[in-house]
């Protein structure tokens, strides 16, 4: 069994990418479980065709404790037999959502949820790098990390931060970076830029997913593209990514870069202009 995690900046399309990719894996005959580690609890909605799966934390609150839960209450089987779990989290501004991740994974292990699987995937909130959300990395639960990013500066910034987290636990937990997944935003020279970022982080751009409105059309129906329009070229993109992950033998210890180096990379690719420091943060009319 391989345990992998998808990290990425909020809004980058991480959950969508993860669900479509896991759907493609299941289509290939792989036995898959998705563990959602995001308080939004939207990591399984396209597989289950539901708004949001009831989370472990929510069910535990209703029952009194995690120990009172039955596995079939928290683990729901969706399309293609994909097993789905949402860890969930507390109400906004109350408590630590990362604790939900820790509690859920520990419960799933004790309840025997990991038996007879080819892949377990963790869908993790990526721009908050607190200890709870880093738990799949920190305790060696996920051995392979895939970072969903794009050619936008903040998505790249988050990717670099996540790489820094992987590096921190690479020697103690054995976790490795499997690659960057570029979920295209149609920015200038995006594929070249992410390939170069990957090179500097000592990894690969494992796949470039082109932008396609069919993804949104499928999401509105709470479906993966694989199910909604299986013959669409976008469905083939997710199938190709799934095959690349299955066959991936390039798992590395990342080499994060500094913020200055990231800005230099953007300047090198013409995304940012190298301007006189005196006009930085000045409006166009003032400059």
Swiss-Prot record:
Keywords: 4Fe-4S, ADP-ribosylation, ATP-binding, Iron, Iron-sulfur, Metal-binding, Nitrogen fixation, Nucleotide-binding, Oxidoreductase. The keyword Protease does not apply. [4Fe-4S] cluster binds at residues 96, 130. The modification ADP-ribosylarginine is found at residue 99. It holds the Pfam family Fer4_NifH. SUPFAM superfamilies: P-loop containing nucleoside triphosphate hydrolases (SSF52540). The keyword Iron-sulfur applies. Binds 1 [4Fe-4S] cluster per dimer. Belongs to the NifH/BchL/ChlL family. The key enzymatic reactions in nitrogen fixation are catalyzed by the nitrogenase complex, which has 2 components: the iron protein and the molybdenum-iron protein. This is Nitrogenase iron protein.
């Amino acid at each position: 069994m391989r345990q992998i995690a998808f990290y990425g900046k909020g809004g980058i399309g991480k959950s969508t990418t993860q669900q479509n990719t896991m759907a493609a894996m299941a289509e290939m005959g792989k036995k898959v479980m998705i563990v959602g580690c995001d308080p939004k609890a939207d990591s399984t909605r396209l597989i289950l065709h539901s708004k949001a799966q009831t989370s472990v934390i929510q069910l535990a609150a209703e029952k009194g404790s995690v120990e009172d839960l039955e596995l079939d209450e928290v683990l729901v089987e969706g399309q293609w037999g994909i097993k789905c779990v949402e860890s969930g989290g507390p109400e906004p501004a109350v408590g630590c959502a990362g604790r939900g991740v820790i509690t859920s994974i520990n419960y799933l292990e004790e309840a025997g949820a990991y038996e007879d699987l080819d892949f377990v995937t963790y869908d993790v909130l990526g721009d908050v790098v607190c200890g709870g959300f880093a738990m799949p990395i920190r305790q060696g639960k996920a051995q392979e990390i895939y970072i969903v990013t794009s050619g936008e500066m903040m998505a790249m910034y988050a990717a670099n931060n996540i790489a820094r987290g992987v590096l921190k636990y690479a020697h103690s937990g054995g976790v490795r970076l499997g690659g960057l997944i570029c979920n295209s935003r149609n920015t200038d020279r995006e594929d070249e830029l992410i390939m170069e970022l990957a090179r500097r982080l000592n990894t690969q751009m494992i796949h470039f997913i082109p932008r396609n409105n069919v993804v949104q059309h499928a999401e509105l129906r709470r479906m993966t593209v694989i199910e909604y329009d299986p013959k669409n070229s976008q469905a083939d993109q997710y199938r190709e990514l799934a095959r690349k992950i299955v066959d991936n033998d390039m798992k590395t210890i990342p080499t994060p870069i500094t913020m200055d180096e990231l800005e230099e990379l953007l300047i090198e690719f013409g995304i940012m202009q190298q301007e006189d420091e005196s006009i930085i943060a000045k409006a166009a009319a003032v400059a």
